[in-house]
Structures are given as structure tokens and as C-alpha cells.
Amino acid sequence: IPDLASSRSTLPVLTKGPTGLLGPRGPYGPLQRFNIELSARGPAAVVGVLGKSFDSWLTKLGLPGPQGRPGPPGPGCRFALSNQCIKLAVEFAGQSKFSSFLANEGKKEGPEGEEGPRTEFDGAYFAGGKFPVVGKPFPQLKVFHAEPPFPTSRSTYGPSGSQPGKKGVVTPFKGNQPLKFNDFLVESDSRCPPDDSSFERSPAVSGHSSPATLNSRMKPAGFPGKGNGAPLKNGIASDPLENLKNRLGSCFPDVLDEPPTSPFFTGPSGYTSDGLNKTPTVSKTLTAAGDPGPGAGKVLESSKTDLVALQGEFQR
């Protein structure tokens, strides 16, 4: 199993999606005329609407064509596993249930600290070349000898920011509780649609948890480090999705900028609601719509024709 932590990559798995959904209804068929004898009732009103005489007062209005051909197979979706869980995913192929055997350690180093607060100092220099700092002096401000003319305006400077973060707390994963495979699986959503922007989402399948429950069985990783600057969002992000990205670090892809809106496993060959009873084929029914079908008209029966509606059709 490759170690993906250093390469900051994810485990790409491409699976062929199911057959696409049927396309939308076809357009209306062409207008056709019939040679029908004018009756003594009704046609005069139609003639008055059109402003001219004609030999057929019944027009074949094209009805919607048949549904389009099925779309192409879906492209499948890439999903990502944290690299500590790759072995778990491989071992799962031959097991239906298992107990946790993988220690998921927290991140050992926090991210870089943010830039520290800026502090104002007076630009008037002492004769010795040093300048007084209003407030607490910072060691990053170097003492230097100024050349005349000495500035007298007040300027705002801050210490050098982006200090390295401190090491986070390592929180090992407790390995004595049963897990489900989808506790470690997060399916990307925003990068999976096909090139054609018109695609259909599969209906939601009950029984699947949302990506925010990824941490339901995982102990949190080390909190982000605090640099010499301001702390990062009180040490941990408040947004659940951002929280996961901070915890998993390099093992979490950037594809989850938008939370997925569909369940983890969809399609006829995917997992059932308990995530344990079928072969691990993960796919997502994202397919392009089919081509519109050709129009096919249908003769309207004259005895059932509503002249008022027919006039509206002619006006349209």
C-alpha cells in the first residue's frame, strides 16, 4: 500500500457508472393539414380568427415525441480515503464485519500560524539610533542606526508573520470498537459531474450518513498549532466540513469545497444501507440527458375538438 501522506494525494478509484437516464420528451412534430369538409358549425369562428379561408379546419398538432435514447454511462466518481485507512479499505474486500485494527494518529504538527497583530511605533528616533515602540516591543523589530533626516511621522509596522505552528496533540484512535467501511469513505461530489453540464442526480437512498459523520467513530486529530500570531479559529474550525479537512490534512482532498448532497453509495451495484452486504463498487448515477426524440403527431378527433382551444393554438 503506498504511503500517500508525503505526496498529498488521494486514492483515486474510478468505477463505471450505471446506464444513463432517459432523455427529455422530444419536440412537437410538424403541423400537417387534412382535407376535411367544412361543417356548418364552428369553422366560421376559426376562419374569422385566421382572417383567411382554408380547406381544412382541423390541423394536426404534433404531440411530444418519444423519450430520447438513454444517455451514456456515467463517469464514476473519485473518492478519497485518509491514508491511514487505505489498508482498512483493502482488507474490507474480503470481510463483512470487522473490528478496528488501525490506529489513526493525530497530526503531529499544526499549520502555520497567522500573521501577528500589527503594532504602531513612533518614527522619531533617539540619538543612539533606537526607536521607542508604543506597547510591548517585539524581538522581530531590529534595532538599527538611522541616518538623518530623522522621520517624525507615525508609521505602523508589525512583526514578521506566518510563524511555524506548534506541534498538535497526538490523539490515537481507539481500536476496540467495530467500524463500518463508510465511516472512512468520503465521496467527492463537486468534481464528479460529466463534461456535459446537464446531468441527473439519483434520488436519495435512505440509510446513509452524511460526510459530516466521518468523525463519528474517529477520535480527533491534533488541533491546529498556534503560531506567534493569532490562533486559527480558536484552534478548530466551527464548520463540520472544514473541521474534517483540518483534521485529516493531506489525506483529505480539495474536492469537498461544496458538501456532497447525495448518499455515499448509489446505483444498482452499490452498497446496501448498512454498507456491508455487497461488493465494494462505489459509483454515482450522474449521467447526461438523452438526445431528444423525433416528433410524432397524433390526429385530433374532430368530434372532441374544442374550438376555443383550437383557436388558441392557431393564435399561438
UniProtKB/Swiss-Prot annotation:
Residues 152-163, 207-216, 269-278 have a biased composition (Polar residues). This is Nautilin-63. Glycosylated; contains mainly glucose, galactose, galactosamine, glucosamine and glucuronic acid. It comes from the Eukaryota. Coiled coil: none annotated. Involved in nacre formation. Affects morphology of calcite crystals in vitro but does not inhibit their formation. Binds chitin. GO terms for biological process: shell calcification. Keywords: Chitin-binding, Glycoprotein, Secreted. One of its GO terms (cellular component) is extracellular region. GO terms for molecular function: chitin binding. Component of the acid-soluble organic matrix of nacreous shell layers (at protein level). The keyword Acyltransferase does not apply. Residues 10-26 have a biased composition (Low complexity).
